[in-house]
Amino acid sequence: MALRQCAIYGKGGIGKSTTTQNLVAALAEAGKKVMIVGCDPKADSTRLILHSKAQNTVMEMAASAGSGEDLELEDVLQIGYGGVKCVESGGPEPGVGCAGRGVITAINFLEEEGAYSDDLDFVFYDVLGDVVCGGFAMPIRENKAQEIYIVCSGEMMAMYAANNIAKGIVKYAHSGSVRLGGLICNSRKTDREDELIMALAAKIGTQMIHFVPRDNVVQHAEIRRMTVIEYDPKAKQADEYRALAQKILNNKLLVIPNPASMEDLEELLMEFGIMEAEDESIVGKAGAEG
Protein backbone atom coordinates (compact mmCIF):
# COMPACT_ATOMS: atom_id res chain seq x y z
CA MET A 1 0.00 0.00 0.00
CA ALA A 2 1.06 3.61 -0.56
CA LEU A 3 2.48 5.40 2.48
CA ARG A 4 -0.21 7.14 4.53
CA GLN A 5 0.90 10.02 6.73
CA CYS A 6 -1.45 10.86 9.59
CA ALA A 7 -1.24 13.54 12.29
CA ILE A 8 -3.02 13.23 15.63
CA TYR A 9 -4.03 16.53 17.23
CA GLY A 10 -6.15 17.40 20.27
CA LYS A 11 -6.32 19.35 23.51
CA GLY A 12 -3.38 18.92 25.89
CA GLY A 13 -4.00 16.07 28.34
CA ILE A 14 -6.76 14.50 26.24
CA GLY A 15 -4.82 11.25 25.75
CA LYS A 16 -3.36 11.77 22.27
CA SER A 17 -0.08 9.97 22.93
CA THR A 18 -1.73 7.01 24.66
CA THR A 19 -4.36 6.70 21.93
CA THR A 20 -1.77 7.04 19.15
CA GLN A 21 0.55 4.39 20.61
CA ASN A 22 -2.26 1.89 21.21
CA LEU A 23 -3.59 2.51 17.70
CA VAL A 24 -0.09 2.05 16.24
CA ALA A 25 0.44 -1.14 18.28
CA ALA A 26 -2.83 -2.49 16.85
CA LEU A 27 -1.69 -1.66 13.30
CA ALA A 28 1.68 -3.33 13.94
CA GLU A 29 -0.10 -6.40 15.34
CA ALA A 30 -2.07 -6.50 12.07
CA GLY A 31 1.21 -6.64 10.13
CA LYS A 32 1.51 -2.97 9.14
CA LYS A 33 4.87 -1.19 9.09
CA VAL A 34 4.59 2.02 11.09
CA MET A 35 6.74 4.95 12.21
CA ILE A 36 5.77 7.35 15.04
CA VAL A 37 7.24 10.85 15.02
CA GLY A 38 6.68 12.55 18.38
CA CYS A 39 6.17 16.28 17.86
CA ASP A 40 6.11 17.35 21.50
CA PRO A 41 9.00 18.67 23.65
CA LYS A 42 7.88 16.30 26.45
CA ALA A 43 9.10 13.39 24.28
CA ASP A 44 6.46 10.98 25.59
CA SER A 45 5.03 9.91 22.24
CA THR A 46 6.95 6.62 22.05
CA ARG A 47 7.43 5.51 25.68
CA LEU A 48 4.78 2.75 25.59
CA ILE A 49 6.15 1.33 22.34
CA LEU A 50 9.77 1.43 23.60
CA HIS A 51 9.07 0.67 27.30
CA SER A 52 11.22 3.67 28.18
CA LYS A 53 10.83 6.87 30.20
CA ALA A 54 11.66 9.17 27.31
CA GLN A 55 13.52 8.61 24.08
CA ASN A 56 16.56 10.74 23.15
CA THR A 57 15.27 13.47 20.87
CA VAL A 58 16.54 14.79 17.55
CA MET A 59 17.07 18.24 19.13
CA GLU A 60 19.04 16.85 22.11
CA MET A 61 21.19 14.64 19.91
CA ALA A 62 21.83 17.46 17.42
CA ALA A 63 22.89 19.76 20.28
CA SER A 64 25.29 17.20 21.76
CA ALA A 65 26.68 16.32 18.31
CA GLY A 66 27.28 19.99 17.48
CA SER A 67 24.82 20.09 14.58
CA GLY A 68 22.20 18.00 12.82
CA GLU A 69 24.71 17.27 10.07
CA ASP A 70 26.77 15.16 12.50
CA LEU A 71 23.80 12.95 13.37
CA GLU A 72 23.13 9.50 11.95
CA LEU A 73 19.64 8.05 11.58
CA GLU A 74 20.40 5.23 14.02
CA ASP A 75 21.25 7.86 16.68
CA VAL A 76 17.63 9.03 16.84
CA LEU A 77 15.52 6.19 15.45
CA GLN A 78 14.69 3.26 17.74
CA ILE A 79 12.69 0.13 17.02
CA GLY A 80 9.96 -0.84 19.48
CA TYR A 81 7.00 -3.22 19.81
CA GLY A 82 5.99 -4.88 16.56
CA GLY A 83 8.91 -3.34 14.67
CA VAL A 84 7.49 0.18 15.06
CA LYS A 85 10.06 2.89 14.22
CA CYS A 86 10.16 5.60 16.90
CA VAL A 87 11.51 9.15 16.70
CA GLU A 88 11.04 12.11 19.06
CA SER A 89 11.62 15.62 17.70
CA GLY A 90 12.08 17.25 21.13
CA GLY A 91 12.43 20.97 21.69
CA PRO A 92 14.47 23.68 23.43
CA GLU A 93 14.74 24.35 27.16
CA PRO A 94 11.45 25.68 28.59
CA GLY A 95 11.22 29.43 28.04
CA VAL A 96 13.88 29.45 25.33
CA GLY A 97 13.18 29.45 21.61
CA CYS A 98 10.39 27.89 19.55
CA ALA A 99 9.48 24.29 20.36
CA GLY A 100 7.84 23.97 16.96
CA ARG A 101 11.29 24.43 15.43
CA GLY A 102 12.17 20.94 16.71
CA VAL A 103 9.38 19.46 14.62
CA ILE A 104 10.68 21.17 11.48
CA THR A 105 14.29 20.09 12.19
CA ALA A 106 13.27 16.50 12.93
CA ILE A 107 11.09 15.98 9.85
CA ASN A 108 13.69 17.52 7.54
CA PHE A 109 16.38 15.30 9.09
CA LEU A 110 14.27 12.14 8.71
CA GLU A 111 13.60 12.93 5.05
CA GLU A 112 17.26 13.62 4.29
CA GLU A 113 18.36 10.40 6.04
CA GLY A 114 15.87 8.15 4.24
CA ALA A 115 13.68 7.30 7.26
CA TYR A 116 10.56 7.31 5.09
CA SER A 117 11.48 3.94 3.59
CA ASP A 118 9.45 2.21 0.88
CA ASP A 119 8.32 -0.57 3.23
CA LEU A 120 6.42 1.82 5.53
CA ASP A 121 2.61 1.72 5.46
CA PHE A 122 1.97 4.54 7.95
CA VAL A 123 3.69 7.49 9.59
CA PHE A 124 1.91 8.99 12.60
CA TYR A 125 2.79 12.46 13.89
CA ASP A 126 1.75 12.88 17.53
CA VAL A 127 1.46 16.66 17.80
CA LEU A 128 1.50 18.88 20.90
CA GLY A 129 -1.72 20.31 22.25
CA ASP A 130 -4.40 22.36 20.60
CA VAL A 131 -2.26 25.07 19.03
CA VAL A 132 -1.95 24.86 15.29
CA CYS A 133 0.86 27.43 15.29
CA GLY A 134 3.92 27.66 13.04
CA GLY A 135 6.16 24.72 13.92
CA PHE A 136 3.45 22.45 15.26
CA ALA A 137 1.42 23.04 12.10
CA MET A 138 4.32 21.77 10.00
CA PRO A 139 2.87 18.28 9.41
CA ILE A 140 -0.18 20.06 7.96
CA ARG A 141 1.43 23.11 6.40
CA GLU A 142 4.14 21.29 4.49
CA ASN A 143 1.80 18.53 3.27
CA LYS A 144 3.66 15.92 5.30
CA ALA A 145 0.43 14.57 6.79
CA GLN A 146 -2.51 14.07 4.46
CA GLU A 147 -4.88 12.77 7.15
CA ILE A 148 -5.65 14.51 10.44
CA TYR A 149 -7.43 12.82 13.33
CA ILE A 150 -8.52 14.89 16.33
CA VAL A 151 -8.73 13.26 19.76
CA CYS A 152 -11.48 14.84 21.85
CA SER A 153 -14.05 14.10 24.55
CA GLY A 154 -17.44 15.38 25.64
CA GLU A 155 -15.84 18.10 27.77
CA MET A 156 -16.38 21.66 26.63
CA MET A 157 -12.71 22.66 26.26
CA ALA A 158 -11.84 19.49 24.34
CA MET A 159 -14.62 20.32 21.88
CA TYR A 160 -13.49 23.95 21.54
CA ALA A 161 -9.97 22.69 20.85
CA ALA A 162 -11.23 20.24 18.20
CA ASN A 163 -13.09 23.06 16.47
CA ASN A 164 -9.99 25.30 16.57
CA ILE A 165 -7.87 22.54 15.05
CA ALA A 166 -10.49 22.16 12.31
CA LYS A 167 -10.01 25.89 11.58
CA GLY A 168 -6.27 25.29 11.23
CA ILE A 169 -6.90 22.42 8.80
CA VAL A 170 -9.13 24.65 6.63
CA LYS A 171 -6.36 27.25 6.45
CA TYR A 172 -3.94 24.78 4.86
CA ALA A 173 -6.36 22.43 3.06
CA HIS A 174 -7.07 24.77 0.17
CA SER A 175 -3.39 25.08 -0.72
CA GLY A 176 -2.52 21.41 -0.14
CA SER A 177 -3.77 17.85 0.21
CA VAL A 178 -4.40 17.75 3.98
CA ARG A 179 -7.85 16.53 5.03
CA LEU A 180 -9.68 15.74 8.27
CA GLY A 181 -10.21 12.00 8.71
CA GLY A 182 -12.45 12.20 11.77
CA LEU A 183 -12.80 12.70 15.51
CA ILE A 184 -11.63 10.03 17.96
CA CYS A 185 -13.64 10.31 21.17
CA ASN A 186 -11.42 9.34 24.10
CA SER A 187 -14.16 9.01 26.69
CA ARG A 188 -14.22 11.01 29.92
CA LYS A 189 -17.58 9.41 30.84
CA THR A 190 -19.52 12.65 30.51
CA ASP A 191 -23.28 12.49 29.87
CA ARG A 192 -24.38 11.36 26.39
CA GLU A 193 -20.77 11.70 25.27
CA ASP A 194 -20.93 9.53 22.15
CA GLU A 195 -24.07 11.30 20.89
CA LEU A 196 -22.52 14.70 21.59
CA ILE A 197 -19.31 13.96 19.66
CA MET A 198 -21.28 12.46 16.76
CA ALA A 199 -23.30 15.70 16.69
CA LEU A 200 -20.11 17.80 16.80
CA ALA A 201 -18.62 15.71 13.98
CA ALA A 202 -21.75 16.20 11.86
CA LYS A 203 -21.70 19.94 12.62
CA ILE A 204 -18.15 20.33 11.25
CA GLY A 205 -18.71 17.95 8.33
CA THR A 206 -16.77 14.89 9.47
CA GLN A 207 -17.35 11.63 11.38
CA MET A 208 -16.70 10.28 14.85
CA ILE A 209 -14.43 7.52 13.60
CA HIS A 210 -14.45 5.66 16.94
CA PHE A 211 -15.59 6.00 20.54
CA VAL A 212 -12.85 4.74 22.89
CA PRO A 213 -14.43 3.90 26.27
CA ARG A 214 -12.67 4.70 29.53
CA ASP A 215 -11.03 1.65 31.12
CA ASN A 216 -8.56 1.36 34.01
CA VAL A 217 -6.54 -1.23 32.07
CA VAL A 218 -5.07 1.71 30.10
CA GLN A 219 -3.51 3.10 33.30
CA HIS A 220 -2.37 -0.37 34.41
CA ALA A 221 -0.56 -0.78 31.09
CA GLU A 222 0.92 2.75 31.22
CA ILE A 223 2.44 2.12 34.66
CA ARG A 224 4.39 -0.70 32.99
CA ARG A 225 5.17 1.55 30.00
CA MET A 226 3.20 -0.70 27.69
CA THR A 227 0.26 -0.39 25.34
CA VAL A 228 -2.90 -2.33 26.22
CA ILE A 229 -2.35 -4.34 23.02
CA GLU A 230 0.90 -5.71 24.46
CA TYR A 231 0.02 -5.70 28.20
CA ASP A 232 -3.35 -7.48 27.96
CA PRO A 233 -4.13 -8.46 24.36
CA LYS A 234 -7.36 -10.22 25.40
CA ALA A 235 -8.78 -7.16 27.17
CA LYS A 236 -11.94 -5.55 25.76
CA GLN A 237 -10.01 -2.28 25.56
CA ALA A 238 -7.41 -3.91 23.28
CA ASP A 239 -10.27 -4.76 20.91
CA GLU A 240 -11.40 -1.11 20.98
CA TYR A 241 -7.96 -0.01 19.76
CA ARG A 242 -8.01 -2.78 17.12
CA ALA A 243 -11.40 -1.52 15.95
CA LEU A 244 -10.03 2.04 15.74
CA ALA A 245 -7.04 0.77 13.74
CA GLN A 246 -9.31 -1.06 11.27
CA LYS A 247 -11.53 2.00 10.85
CA ILE A 248 -8.52 4.20 10.07
CA LEU A 249 -7.16 1.52 7.75
CA ASN A 250 -10.44 1.52 5.79
CA ASN A 251 -11.25 5.22 6.11
CA LYS A 252 -12.19 6.95 2.85
CA LEU A 253 -13.99 9.95 4.37
CA LEU A 254 -11.34 12.66 4.18
CA VAL A 255 -12.84 16.14 4.18
CA ILE A 256 -12.12 19.84 4.38
CA PRO A 257 -14.01 20.60 7.59
CA ASN A 258 -16.54 23.35 8.12
CA PRO A 259 -15.72 24.63 11.63
CA ALA A 260 -18.62 25.67 13.84
CA SER A 261 -19.13 29.20 15.10
CA MET A 262 -18.90 29.82 18.85
CA GLU A 263 -22.69 30.27 18.88
CA ASP A 264 -23.19 26.89 17.16
CA LEU A 265 -20.90 25.18 19.67
CA GLU A 266 -22.69 26.74 22.61
CA GLU A 267 -26.07 25.72 21.16
CA LEU A 268 -24.81 22.15 20.85
CA LEU A 269 -23.61 22.15 24.46
CA MET A 270 -26.97 23.52 25.62
CA GLU A 271 -28.86 20.93 23.57
CA PHE A 272 -26.97 18.15 25.35
CA GLY A 273 -27.26 19.76 28.77
CA ILE A 274 -23.53 20.46 29.16
CA MET A 275 -24.18 24.19 29.33
CA GLU A 276 -27.21 26.05 30.61
CA ALA A 277 -29.06 28.50 28.39
CA GLU A 278 -27.47 31.88 28.84
CA ASP A 279 -28.95 33.88 31.68
CA GLU A 280 -27.11 37.14 32.32
CA SER A 281 -28.48 37.28 35.89
CA ILE A 282 -26.44 34.21 36.96
CA VAL A 283 -23.10 35.11 35.30
CA GLY A 284 -20.33 35.23 37.91
CA LYS A 285 -22.53 33.91 40.73
CA ALA A 286 -21.34 31.02 42.86
CA GLY A 287 -23.55 27.95 43.22
CA ALA A 288 -24.56 28.89 46.78
CA GLU A 289 -25.73 32.32 45.59
CA GLY A 290 -27.89 30.91 42.78
UniProtKB/Swiss-Prot annotation:
Q: In the Enzyme Commission scheme, what number(s) does this protein have?
A: 1.18.6.1
**Catalytic reaction(s) noted:** N2 + 8 reduced [2Fe-2S]-[ferredoxin] + 16 ATP + 16 H2O = H2 + 8 oxidized [2Fe-2S]-[ferredoxin] + 2 NH4(+) + 16 ADP + 16 phosphate + 6 H(+)
Q: Which GO terms describe its molecular function?
A: 4 iron, 4 sulfur cluster binding; ATP binding; metal ion binding; nitrogenase activity
- Where does the sequence pass through the membrane? none
Q: Where is the PTM ADP-ribosylarginine found along the chain? A: 101
Keyword hit for Endoplasmic reticulum:
no
Source domain of life is Bacteria
**Gene3D superfamilies registered for this protein in UniProt:** P-loop containing nucleotide triphosphate hydrolases
Q: Return the broad EC class.
A: oxidoreductase
Modification(s) after translation: The reversible ADP-ribosylation of Arg-101 inactivates the nitrogenase reductase and regulates nitrogenase activity.
Q: Where does this protein hold [4Fe-4S] cluster?
A: 98, 133
Name what cofactor the protein needs: [4Fe-4S] cluster
Residues binding ATP are 10-17
Which HAMAP family does this chain map to?
Answer: NifH
Its biological purpose: The key enzymatic reactions in nitrogen fixation are catalyzed by the nitrogenase complex, which has 2 components: the iron protein (component 2) and a component 1 which is either a molybdenum-iron protein, a vanadium-iron, or an iron-iron protein.
Instruction: State the similarity comment.
Output: Belongs to the NifH/BchL/ChlL family.
The UniProt subunit note reads as follows: Homodimer.
Q: What else is known?
A: This subunit is associated with the vanadium-iron nitrogenase component 2.
Name recorded for this polypeptide: Nitrogenase iron protein 2
Biological source species: Azotobacter chroococcum mcd 1
Q: Which gene encodes it?
A: vnfH
